[in-house]
């Protein structure tokens, strides 16, 4: 009987820990009756499980009689140990720009005390595929790419960071004076952003799409293999040296969406969504990113 009680209490502890990860210090907690209903448990067993979490130092609750119970302190790492999240792995773009490095460094800093790792991979499609298959816990993509994936089932937009947090600006790159004569446009089929923006920009135009690697784009224009490519401009002086020019992309909100970083989780991974809400201070993350971009701080990820 005692062994059965311990097993049931463990299940209730896991459910309570998942709930508490979504709360913030100072919040009024649900009543014990409400929690018991959510845990599908008795009031007594739910109280015992809550006491266990308190005794372990995972939480501290202040009980105010008729005014309810309030969460005063919480240890995210301790709570994580009760929900089978021993570490977090995030699929992230290759860190080839300071903006990406700042994002990676800033996000990791938010998970202080929680084992947090990156799997750097090129192409949003593969990052999302690995997320859906359960290989990773979350994935960083642009809002533009995210909106296309969210039409599928199984994904949740868990964190939005605002414009120009993913890339600075995509532009149309072509040889000088030839922006009106584009017949062949380069396209990396692994890049959801580039595919969508190319379709938006050229619309129904009779333009041939040429498959290439994103990082070969500029050289392929210079060689004459393609006439243009939509590309994230990082260094203007590089364009000048190569004899190519950039034209800003305007007149469609999707171009701005491509500059915003978002974090996706699986739709049923409530602990990960709650964890992001609980530990990420968006203002601090973005300030960290900007310090890395400006050179005030070295990235650490």
Walk through the language-model features, giving the residues of each:
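N-terminal "mature head" segments of proteins
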Residues: 1, 22-25, 41, 55, ...
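Extreme N-terminal segment that seeds HTH/winged-HTH DNA-binding domains in transcriptional regulators
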Residues: 1-31
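Short coil turns linking two alpha-helices in DNA-binding domains
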Residues: 40-49
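Short, hydrophobic-biased segments on the C-terminal half of alpha helices
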Residues: 50-51, 128
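HTH-adjacent hinge/linker in prokaryotic transcriptional regulators
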Residues: 54-104
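C-terminal regulatory/effector modules of DNA-binding transcriptional regulators
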Residues: 122-125, 132-301
């Amino acid at each position: 009987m005692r062994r059965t009680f311990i097993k049931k209490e463990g299940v209730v502890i896991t459910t309570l820990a998942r709930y508490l990860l979504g709360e913030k210090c100072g919040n009024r907690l649900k009543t014990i009756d409400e929690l018991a209903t959510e845990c599908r448990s008795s009031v007594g067993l739910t109280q015992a499980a809550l006491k266990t979490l308190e005794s372990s130092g995972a939480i501290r609750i202040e009980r105010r009689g008729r005014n309810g119970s309030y969460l005063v302190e919480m240890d995210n790492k301790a709570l994580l140990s009760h929900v089978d999240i021993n570490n977090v792995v995030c699929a992230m773009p290759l860190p080839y720009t300071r903006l990406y490095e700042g994002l990676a460094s800033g996000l990791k800093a938010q998970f202080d005390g929680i084992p947090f790792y990156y799997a750097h991979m090129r192409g949003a499609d593969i990052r999302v595929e690995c997320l859906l298959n359960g290989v990773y816990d979350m994935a960083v993509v642009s809002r533009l790419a995210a909106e296309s994936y969210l039409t599928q089932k199984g994904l949740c937009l868990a964190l939005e960071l605002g414009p120009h947090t993913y890339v600075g600006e995509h532009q149309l790159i072509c040889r000088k004076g030839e922006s009106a004569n584009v017949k062949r446009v380069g396209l990396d089929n692994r890049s959801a952003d580039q595919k969508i923006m190319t379709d938006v920009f050229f619309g129904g135009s009779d333009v041939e799409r040429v498959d290439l690697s994103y990082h070969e784009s500029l050289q392929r224009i210079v060689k004459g293999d393609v006439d243009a490519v939509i590309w994230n401009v990082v260094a203007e002086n590089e364009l000048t040296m190569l004899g190519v020019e950039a034209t800003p992309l305007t007149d469609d909100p999707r171009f701005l969406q491509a500059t915003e970083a978002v974090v996706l989780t699986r739709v049923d991974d409530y602990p990960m969504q709650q964890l992001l809400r609980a530990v990420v201070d968006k203002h601090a993350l973005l300030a960290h990113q900007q310090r890395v971009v400006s050179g005030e701080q070295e990235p650490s990820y």
